[in-house]
Amino acid sequence: LGLSKAYLHEDQFFPGWTVLVFHRHVTELFQLAPPERVQLIEEVSRVAGALSEIYHAKKINYELLGNQLPHIHWHLIPRLPDDPAPLEPVWRVPHPPVHLTGVMLQHTIDRVRSALREKR
């Protein structure tokens, strides 16, 4: 990725939940120059496509809010066939947090990186 960095969200109750963070501080999408905006949307799409492929998602939720953290960043959330609350936004689904550690965390990161390499 050129303008952003992708991170797995610390809570993986919704498997594959990824946060894509723009490389410099900007609070609004319209503040970007058109070429940057186009490239950033391409990066969002590339990561979303990789997540969809890895997790066989029925849908990817795209969240670009910024109320709590005023910096351009997307939450990309694969919604799976066995989703526990398919009609609800993830923020409204009470759940115990799921934290990946060690081998599982590295395996997940490696899968995403591999899928992104294929999406170039």
Where are these regions (language model features)?
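HIT superfamily nucleotide-processing domains
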Residues: 1-120
